[in-house]
Design a protein with these regions (language model features):
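Sec-dependent signal peptide recognition
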Residues: 1-8
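Ser/Thr-rich, Pro/Gly/Ala-heavy low-complexity intrinsically disordered linkers and tails
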Residues: 10-60
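Secreted/luminal cysteine- and crosslink-motif detector
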Residues: 14, 116-117, 123, 315, ...
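Extracellular and organelle-lumenal recognition/adhesion modules and their flexible linkers in secreted
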Residues: 54-194
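GH16 jelly-roll
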Residues: 187, 191-446
Length: 446
């Protein structure tokens, strides 16, 4: 677990209004999404029925955007920067959105299904080569845009998949540059179906007592970072549908003590605190995909919970480390680390976010951390918001070990642990024991 910190600031523009188009969705992506089409009666239509049945064709999927053609005033659109709703140049009806430079309109659509496919379409025309953009962002993935430079109205679309924790998206029409006008009209957002991302490995922690030893092994003893705790298996267990990792104050002799030793692991005569670190080492590893973990942290001083991965080949840090979540010193961290020219000395791509900025009561709830990983790029998200990302073109090991290799182009294994004190955990003077780190589920999709 790394702890070099570099501040990352998220910037945004414009104000948004939010429209809830359904009663909401449970963010538990294990719930199936029906692959059916609704008939006028509200019953599901059997897709295997003959097309020429004599019945009228089914209605098209509902448009989830409210006031998509700007016919009913500005609401719920947020029109900003000099863009305006005009009674001319409409594709259909009477009204359209007119944009010029660095202005546009946006709308937040809520009530979407997580891990599902949607299509955003719209009509646009332009009087210059400076593009008009109709796009979508803040849905749990890359911002996507359709580009319009033509003088006549043309329809275009983008298709996107919502994140595992995301039930909303921001749609917009925007012109970035130039002074000549462009127009947008008849935007449409429709549900296309469930995502094709397949669940390939998971633990829902639905049992009681000991963990599934076909999925997990344990770290033991004093392990790293001069942390206070002694890791032992009995501090990790299933309870009430969750993984509990418990830090305890308990004292006994250190079985590895060596009198006169200068190694911090063996110089300690006594174990004063215990905790657990569970790992999929020798059980499961994967290369590329989407890791999703729902967990709850306390943000207490002296604690250092983490969700992280290590590459299966080469020594640290040249095997690659991904800190999907670390929590210490009042911050949430998201880090990538790889090897340099000096042994045991990592190159860090780090970000940290003060828990206080997330608002009151944040630690009372569970939250969803994601690591999206492919051969080109990695992204870490918290509740759908990007905390850190990295291009794999920049994560090449130096000469110390596995020189010239990319440690993020090999399988990785998962670790979940609760450290106490140490280099980053800080003072435990005000910490009450036992203290718990809770994990609801771990899922890997490909």
């Amino acid at each position: 677990m790394g702890w070099r910190i570099a501040l990352v600031v998220a910037l945004g523009c414009g104000n948004s209004q939010s429209v809830k188009v359904t009663s909401g969705a449970d963010t538990d992506v294990s719930a199936p999404v029906p692959d059916t089409t609704a008939t006028d009666s509200g019953d599901a239509m059997d897709s295997s029925a003959p097309a020429d049945s004599g019945d009228p064709p089914a209605d098209p999927p509902a448009n989830l955007i409210i006031n998509p053609g700007f016919e009913d005033g500005e609401s719920p659109w947020s029109i900003w920067g000099g863009a305006e709703r005009v009674p001319e140049q409409a594709h259909s009806g009477t009204w359209a959105l007119k944009t010029t430079a660095t202005n546009g309109s946006e709308q937040v659509v809520e009530g979407l299904e997580p891990n599902s496919v949607y299509r955003l379409s719209g009509w646009g025309k332009n009087t210059s080569a400076d593009p008009l953009l109709i796009g979508v962002k803040d849905y749990g993935g890359e911002e996507l845009r359709a580009v319009f430079t033509e003088a006549e109205y043309r329809e275009d679309s983008v298709t996107f998949t919502t994140g595992f924790a995301h039930t909303q998206a921001k749609v917009y029409a925007y012109k970035h540059a130039g002074s000549e006008p462009a127009w947008a009209d008849d935007l449409r957002l429709q549900y296309e179906g469930p995502s094709d991302r397949t669940l390939v490995w998971s633990d829902e922690f639905d049992g009681e007592g000991a963990l599934d030893d076909s999925k997990w092994t344990f770290e033991n003893g004093f392990v790293r970072n001069e942390e206070v705790q002694w890791y032992q298996p009995e501090n990790a267990f299933q309870e009430d549908g969750m993984l509990v990792i418990e830090g305890r104050a308990e004292e006994r002799p250190n079985p590895g003590h060596v009198p006169g030793s200068t190694d911090w692991r063996t110089s300690r005569e006594t174990i004063t605190h215990t905790s657990a670190s569970v790992t999929t080492k020798d059980r499961y590893s994967w290369q590329y995909g989407h890791l999703v973990v729902r967990a709850k942290v306390t943000n207490h001083g002296g604690t250092w919970p983490a969700i992280w991965t290590l590459g299966i080949d080469c020594e640290w840090p040249s095997n690659g480390e991904v800190d999907v979540m670390e929590n210490y010193g009042g911050d949430i961290l998201a880090n990538f680390a790889w090897g340099t020219d000096a042994r045991w000395t990592p190159s860090w791509d780090s970000s940290h976010w003060p828990v206080a900025d997330f608002g009151p009561g944040w630690t009372d709830d569970f939250h969803i951390w994601e690591w999206e990983w492919n051969a080109d790029r990695m992204v870490i998200r918290l509740d759908g918001a990007v905390l850190n990302d990295a291009s794999l073109t920049s994560t090449i090991n130096g000469s110390a070990a596995c020189a010239g290799e990319n440690p993020f182009q090999q399988p990785h294994r998962l670790l979940l642990n609760l450290a106490l004190g140490g280099h980053a955990g800080g003072s435990m003077a005000d910490l009450t024991f036992p203290t718990r780190y809770l994990v609801d589920y771990v899922r890997v999709y490909q």
